[in-house]
Amino acid sequence: MAKIKVEEQYFDYAPPVRVHGSLRLLLRYVPEEHLNGLHTITLTNSESLRSVRGKITSEKQRFRPADCQGLYGKGRIFLNIDLIFSQDPELFLLFPPFKTFLIGEVLYHEIGHHIHRLEEPGYRSDKEVVADEWKDKLLELFLKQRYWYLARPVRLLSPLLRLIVARLRARIGEDDT
């Protein structure tokens, strides 16, 4: 496996759950050739990125780095852990497949940018669509290989799970206002 350094760089923040193990697990399921040239993944929080000047343009919109769940640039990935976990109740994070899925969505999207830059440069102008396509491929590969036994129960319970998640998210939204 490619030697990728994982750094934790938080400012006045401690993640509600351990993230490092889930990150390493997700990386094990990415084909080796897609990780070549990727040397550092930094786990951080939005407060730590507030000092980064400038904005990032994505899909004709401009964002501050502190407002992004993940960032990719020339072999480095930054995962903004507090934003990744902010939309879901902490209770859900205690369920390892759910926590790993949340991290995987952002990590695999950023790896999609890396793959696009190295293997398909100039392939398409819409980099976000390409990164999302790679995210879907890598996440499907991971879920089929790692959590194959959850496929049938999740399929049967998905309408109920969607309802529960929607209500919890609505309740969180009400608490914020």
Where do the protein language model's features map onto the residues?
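Generic beta-structure capping elements
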Residues: 80-82
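Active-site recognition of the HExxH zinc-binding catalytic motif
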Residues: 105-118, 131
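Short pre-active-site segment immediately N-terminal to the catalytic Zn-binding motif
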Residues: 84-106, 121-122
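Hydrophobic (often cysteine-bearing) scaffold residues that line and stabilize catalytic clefts
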Residues: 19, 104, 127
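Long, well-structured alpha-helical subdomains associated
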Residues: 2-7, 17-20, 142-177
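Short conserved catalytic/interaction loops centered on acidic-Pro-aromatic/His motifs
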Residues: 117-130, 146-150
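A metal-dependent hydrolase signature that marks the N-terminal structural subdomain at the beginning
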Residues: 1-78, 89-95, 175-177
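An active-site-proximal "capping" alpha-helix that borders the catalytic cofactor pocket
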Residues: 126-141
